[in-house]
Amino acid sequence: VGDHHVTGSPYYQNTPMLGRLLAEWGDADVGALYLLPLWQPVLLAEQIATLASIAEGRFIMQCGLGRGDDQFSALGQNIRFRPSAFEESLKCLRQMWRGETVSSKGRFHFSAATISPIPPEPIDVWIGANATVAIERAARMGDAWLAEPSLTVEQAKTAFNTYRQARERLGLSMPDTIAIRRDIHVSERPNEADMVQRQINQTGYRGFSMDALTIGDPDQVASEFRALYEIGYTDIIIRSLHPDQGHTIASLQRLAKVKDLLK
C-alpha cells in the first residue's frame, strides 16, 4: 500500500486501508510504504506499531524520501530537507519501537515521547532508493533495499552493484532481501502485449522508459524476472499497468503461469 497525499483523484490512505485488509490477511508478510519526511515521527511510530500488533505475520515498513512540492507544502514540510529528515525520523522510529523515550530537536521537534503498544517483533525496514547517494543510505540504514520500478534491467544491474559495493565498504554482508518493483501486464498472447504497449506508449507512463515496463506473455515476463533474479534480486513486487480492472485481474491470474515457469 503506497503513500500519496493531496492527489487529484481519490487515493485511499495506507494505514486505514491496511487495517481493514489485515482482518482478511492471515499470517503472510504485510507492509506499507511511508514517505518519512512527510510524517510526524511519533504519530507514525504509533500507527505502524498498531498495525504490527494486529498483523499475524512479519510487518515491513517500506520507506523513502518522497517527491513533489505539492504534498510537501500541503503537509508543512520543506522538500529541501528530505535526506536529513528521513534519517532523523528513521532513527526516532526505531528507538520508539524498542520502547525507548525519545526527544528530537532537529528537523522534528518533540520531547519525551513513548508509544504503546510497541511492536511484538522488530519491524523490517526496506528503504526505496535510486540515486547513488540514496542507495548508499539504504545500504547503511536499511534491513533491505527496494529498487525503483523506473529501472531497465541493465540499470537494475548497475544499481545492484552500487548497493553491493556500499555494503562491502561498510563491512556488511548482503541482506536476505533485495527487492525491486516492476510495473507489469501479463498478456495471453504476444500480439495482446504489443497492443497494450502501444497504448501505454501513446499516453506515456509516469515518465518511465518503455524498457522499464514489463509487458508480455507469461514466457516473456518470466524471462525478465529470471534476469532480475540472476542479478541478485530476491523479491519482485508488482504493480499492474492496465487501467481496466478486468484486464488487471486477468493479468494477475496469468502470474501463476509465470511463477510455474520460474520454478
List PLM regions with ranges.
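Active-site-adjacent structural elements that line small-molecule/cofactor binding pockets in enzymes
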Residues: V1-K263
